[in-house]
Amino acid sequence: GINCSGDNTGGMEEALQVAAGADVILLTIGGKNGWGVTSTVGEGIDSTDIDLPGRQEEFARRAYDLHKKTVVLHYDGRPLSNEFVASHFDAIMEVWQPGEYGSQALCKVLFGEQSPSGHLPVTVARNVGQLPVYYGLPRGSGYVSAGHTGMIRNKNGYINDTAEPL
């Protein structure tokens, strides 16, 4: 694999070679919780960017180019979003921060012993401009509604992107 933050690509070529020989790719992406410079989420580690940290999108694009069935395992403890990943892979499993028994639970789901059902209890923002997400309002925010003719004349509320979540 690769380091989840920074520009280090060490291990990427080896990981892609292993993936090329696999029937199914389990692509683990997201953040790393903890303290210090290698962490991307945690106490005192703030970010203005909700895209995948480091070279992870590049890694995901190269894995996609292998044309293999791929299940994305998305680890994070804060909002992370990537439009390429959301629109190109066979399945995405939001793993959050799974804890001590997370690997056992994940294996049960991946091998069909458990069947996760339902929908995420949260909305995944497309970009940082959609944050914070207002869960109590039907259109996401009290400031934007279809046909609004006040100060914000763009009915989506954005001049450069859609208001639709991923």
Predicted regions and their residues:
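Secreted, periplasmic, or luminal enzymes acting at the cell surface/secretory milieu
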Residues: 1, 75-166
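Hydrophobic helix-and-loop "lid/oligomerization" segment in the mid-to-C-terminal part
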Residues: 1-88
